[in-house]
């Protein structure tokens, strides 16, 4: 059984994961309109992944005797000055999500809810991967600079990142 405090914190994380999905979806739309098909595909895949994270939390809350809440979402930013800015925003958001997960883990330890703590370890690991991937992408973007050929290759190569990442993901 979940305490009301942990249930509230998990419901907040459900909202954050849903907003993350919307953020990636908005980024996918922006990239697609700009002709960055590889980036758009990457963002669509990330949006779906964030939705899966949300669903995993929803099921956990409900299975543990809580009531998962679906709440109103903040509208994501839909325009960016450059694809570099878009990925900078992505990285900032992933750091925000990591901090939120860490706070949630802290609450579970304070309340001695070791089952929820154990469940959240998957999210901790996932966020390490998400931040590392965003940082790697930003490093590549910084290497490219204003080179149009580099942007073309990046757009093509990010599809490989999506394929290789998908093959190593947890199937839950």
What does each model-identified segment do?
Residues 1-172:
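Iron-associated oxidoreductase/ferritin-like identity signal
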């Amino acid at each position: 059984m979940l305490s009301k405090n942990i249930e509230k914190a998990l419901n907040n994380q459900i909202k954050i994961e849903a907003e993350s999905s919307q953020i990636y979806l908005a980024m996918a739309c922006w990239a697609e309109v700009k002709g960055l098909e590889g980036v758009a595909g990457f963002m669509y895949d990330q949006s779906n992944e964030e939705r899966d994270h949300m669903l995993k939390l929803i099921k956990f809350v409900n299975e543990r005797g809580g009531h998962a809440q679906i709440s109103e979402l903040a509208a994501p930013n839909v325009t960016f000055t450059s694809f570099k800015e878009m990925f900078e925003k992505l990285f900032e958001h992933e750091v925000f999500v990591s901090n939120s997960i860490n706070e949630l883990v802290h609450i579970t330890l304070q309340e001695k809810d070791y089952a929820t703590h154990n469940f959240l370890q998957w999210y901790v690991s996932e966020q390490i991967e998400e931040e590392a991937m965003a940082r790697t992408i930003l490093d590549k973007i910084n290497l490219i600079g204003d080179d149009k050929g580099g942007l073309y290759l990046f757009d093509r190569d990010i599809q490989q990142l999506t394929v290789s990442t998908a093959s190593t993901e947890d199937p839950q």
